[in-house]
């Protein structure tokens, strides 16, 4: 029997996931294309994913689909076949495999959104398909050696903190919408320079590179498949990986280790650390970096105040 919505608690689903022994893959994919009946798409995806024990977070909008999912490994080719039958626009869809296959999701969530990435763009004649030039790891490494070429990280500040390409510019923000608003005046001095943009899996740079070109920037490039695609391609071709630190991911893993360098610091003691946690006090739930010692000393909380409140809640 199939359902259109989850019927179990997150606690039950988490317990079920961690008792599972079947190997899984964490995948991500996106595609900008026109979807006329978003509710029909949403329900069809939920029914089929539920049937095959596929978990994760999927956004559907009239502009396309954006998904991060955890699937039983044996259903990888089913996913590709299902997506093609869902819409021929999804044939030859680029599917990013995660850099590790730790348990990433235990809930299936398929939601209809106004946009698959909230960008704040309201210009009716903006063309999201007028994107930058895709580049792979060999070209990326070569361009990183050229100090005249600018690299821009199109992720949030907390993502940038634990890992990035050396000397990449951080567009400081907590939302993609805010980045797009700020990037044009901030980078106005570089309209005639070569600019390389990157994000986790590529979806934000589809919009970001098109937005830059819309605003008169001509020489715009972006990493095909984002950081994940770059790492896979570099490993496949035996090339050095020049990304430093960890890649932040939006699932229960929090991050994927790419290099041995630790480039971020514990919020509480200032020691090198690259472990993100959420404050144990549920009314706070702040996302922050915490080292192992402070995790013990503060009982997984972000402050003494939250530690006291969390302890009183448990009495």
PLM feature spans:
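Short, well-ordered loop/turn elements at secondary-structure boundaries
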Residues: 145-148, 191-192
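Rhodanese-like catalytic fold shared by cysteine-dependent sulfurtransferases
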Residues: 2-133, 156-194, 203-315
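Short hydrophobic beta-strand that contains or immediately precedes a catalytic carboxylate
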Residues: 148-155
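Internal catalytic-core helix/loop-beta-alpha segment
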Residues: 131-146
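Substrate-contacting helices/loops that form the catalytic groove of nucleic-acid
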Residues: 200
């Amino acid at each position: 029997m199939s359902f259109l919505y989850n019927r179990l608690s997150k606690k039950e689903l988490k317990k079920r996931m961690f008792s599972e022994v079947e190997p899984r893959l964490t995948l991500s994919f996106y595609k900008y294309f026109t979807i006329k009946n978003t509710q029909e798409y949403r329900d069809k995806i939920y029914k089929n994913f539920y049937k095959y024990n596929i978990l994760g977070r999927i956004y559907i909008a009239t502009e396309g689909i954006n998904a991060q999912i955890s699937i039983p490994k044996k259903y990888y080719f089913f996913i590709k076949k299902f997506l093609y039958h869902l819409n021929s626009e999804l044939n030859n869809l680029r599917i990013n495999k995660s850099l590790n296959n730790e348990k990433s999701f235990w809930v299936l969530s398929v939601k209809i959104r106004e946009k698959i990435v909230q960008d704040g763009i309201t210009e009716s004649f903006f063309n999201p398909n007028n994107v930058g030039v895709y580049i792979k790891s060999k070209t990326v490494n070569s361009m990183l050696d050229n100090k005249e070429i600018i690299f821009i990280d199109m992720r949030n500040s907390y993502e940038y903190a634990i890992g990035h390409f050396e000397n990449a510019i951080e567009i400081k923000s907590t939302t993609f919408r805010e980045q797009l608003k700020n990037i044009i005046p901030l980078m106005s001095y570089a309209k005639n320079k070569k600019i390389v943009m990157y994000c986790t899996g590529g979806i934000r740079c589809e919009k970001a590179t098109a937005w830059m070109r819309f605003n008169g920037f001509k020489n715009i490039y972006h990493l095909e498949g984002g950081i994940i695609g770059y790492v896979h391609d570099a490993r496949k071709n035996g090339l050095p990986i020049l990304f430093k630190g960890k890649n932040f991911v939006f699932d229960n893993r929090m991050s994927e280790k790419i290099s041995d360098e630790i480039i971020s610091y514990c919020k509480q003691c200032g020691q090198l650390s690259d472990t993100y946690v959420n404050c144990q006090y549920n009314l706070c739930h702040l996302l922050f970096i915490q080292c192992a010692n402070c995790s013990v000393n503060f009982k997984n909380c972000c402050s003494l105040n939250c530690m006291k409140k969390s302890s009183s809640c448990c009495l």
